[in-house]
From Swiss-Prot:
Function according to Swiss-Prot or TrEMBL: Negative regulator of class I heat shock genes (grpE-dnaK-dnaJ and groELS operons). Prevents heat-shock induction of these operons.
Gene3D superfamilies cross-referenced by the UniProt entry: 3.30.450.40, Winged helix-like DNA-binding domain superfamily/Winged helix DNA-binding domain
Protein name stated in the entry: Heat-inducible transcription repressor HrcA
Origin: domain of life: Bacteria
This protein's encoding gene: hrcA
Keywords, comma-separated and alphabetical: Repressor, Stress response, Transcription, Transcription regulation
Transcription regulation found in the keyword field: yes
GO molecular function, one term: DNA binding
Keyword Protease: no
Similarity section: Belongs to the HrcA family.
Amino acid sequence: MENRTEMSQLRASKKDSKISHVLLMAIKLYLESGQPVGSKLLKETYCSDLSSATIRNYFAQLETDGFLRKNHISGGRIPTDLAFRYYADHCSPVLEQEEISIIQQKLKELPEYSKNIVKDLQKASEILSEILQLPVCFSSPRFESDSVTNIQLVSIDDLRVVFVLSTEFGQLFTDVLWLPEQLPENSLKRIESFLQNYLRKHPSSVPLSQKEEDLGMTLYNEVVVRYLTRYCHFSEEDLYQTGLSRLLKYEVFKDPETLAQGLSFFENRKHMCQLLNSHLHKKAPTTFIGRELSDIVGNADPSCAVITVPYYMDRTPLGAFGVLGPMNLPYQQVFGTLSLFTERLKTILTQSFYKFKLSFRRPCPTDPRCSQKPAELTRRSSIKLLPAKELT
């Protein structure tokens, strides 16, 4: 009796294995062709050891289990988000040698090491977006001992100006400030030049009135306090994104509603931080598909997928990259690309951190040490701006 039970379980196991193989091959064929998969075509390509009738029977069971749905026009089967989840969990990263060579050549655009960490991460995200032809975002902690290297003033209208601070590590800080009155022609440029020289401790290269100098220092001190406050007291990682227009090349995103859902999700800082941080200590990519994203954002099925992967300095995760695309992504190629990409980035970041003795901070939303007093902010920030006494 026990032998019969064991044989029955063995036959069931073999059948499940065959059904699993049919499902994986059907998804693979669908990803390659973009067309609904029929039993005859699947037999001719990947399942020659099975009859068309057997494949149809397996298709019927997979439909019942929610992995496939029937296309009413062609009669073929289309994978569901549950099927893509199964495929993402069971497929291995695969890249052709030619693809590996192209990726490695692209990654040579990144430096061997650099102090300009944020700028290099932004460059890396541009490269990854170009390779995958997909939108990419990444999270970043705050790096210590940064220095403001440049100041720019951009006029919006007669009474408003955009103040732009750029730092040695590639950070950008912008804010809109109000002017007390309309400035004469070229006055703003003279103030900008004065502040750039002041920042570098150089004598002013252009003559300006005492009124212009006083206004320049007022604007400077105001934006410094705002910058230090934001730098020291932040509740979320910094997020950067690129390549959103690349979604338009995919058929599913040509529908305005689907495109809007995908973009709104990708641009939602709270949701993206939640995804990027959820598997920060897992070195392999993590995939969120279809309804799994809907559970997070709390609205209709966005019909898209997000793949996240952390990036490391030595054995310490610094942040994560996220890739947005349709559910029918070429998962094997994406996983393989992300593996090469993060390994290269890990080497660069590790060398940079040890060479320049860099450090970083995580968000601290309730840290009582993050005082709002300007002098205290200056002491805590590790940002080279003004001495504390000039801010009190």
